[in-house]
């Protein structure tokens, strides 16, 4: 059985790695130990997901819940564990489809501030110069690659009057 001290030690190891050490002076007495034990030692230290994948989940949740101070801190941590600036922005683009474009834009603005402070650089690609026909063809190719034969059956069947038009 894992002791509280072992959880705390595992948690603090992760906190140091991602620069997330807190202070009770900033929160409440005993709070930081609880965070080290439960959050970082108990959850972040679990097997099953690498820290980079955990950060994709964390950044998404913080963005969707508009936790800007924590988002700023965790963008910095995501860079420290190896996510690139571009990958972080892509997390916000993807999550923005579910949480709204203004929410994604706020997260991207915070990310750019953190990138500037941390010296994180990324290439800006020109996007959106395709004609509508080229864009539609790209989407159909992606659908075929993702779904294979299923891309034209069931709900994606062009003959399906309800959902077929979404896929053609």
Regions found by a protein language model. Give the residues of each.
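Short alpha-helix boundary/capping elements
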Residues: 61-68, 99-100
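Helix N-cap / loop-to-helix initiation motif
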Residues: 50, 82-89
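Substrate/cofactor-recognition hotspot
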Residues: 94, 99-105
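Short, structured motif recognition centered on aromatic/hydrophobic residues
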Residues: 54-62, 71, 75, 88-92
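Short, charged low-complexity intrinsically disordered segments located at boundaries
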Residues: 88-93, 122-126
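Acidic, glycine/proline-rich low-complexity segments that act as flexible tails and inter-domain linkers
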Residues: 1-52, 65, 80, 104-168
């Amino acid at each position: 059985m894992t002791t509280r001290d072992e959880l705390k030690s595992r948690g603090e190891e992760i906190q140091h790695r991602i620069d997330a050490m807190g202070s009770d002076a900033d929160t409440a007495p005993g709070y930081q130990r609880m965070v080290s034990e439960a959050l970082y030692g108990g959850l972040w230290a679990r097997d099953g997901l690498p820290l980079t994948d955990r950060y994709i989940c964390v950044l998404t949740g913080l963005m969707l819940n508009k936790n800007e101070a924590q988002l700023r801190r965790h963008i910095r941590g995501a860079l420290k564990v190896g996510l690139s600036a571009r990958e972080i922005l892509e997390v916000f683009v993807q999550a923005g489809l579910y949480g709204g474009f203004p929410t994604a834009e706020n997260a991207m603005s915070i990310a750019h501030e953190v990138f500037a402070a941390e010296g994180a650089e990324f290439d800006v690609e020109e996007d959106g110069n395709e004609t509508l026909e080229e864009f539609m063809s790209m989407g159909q190719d992606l659908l075929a690659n993702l779904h294979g034969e299923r891309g034209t059956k069931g709900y994606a069947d062009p003959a399906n009057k309800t959902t077929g038009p979404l896929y053609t």
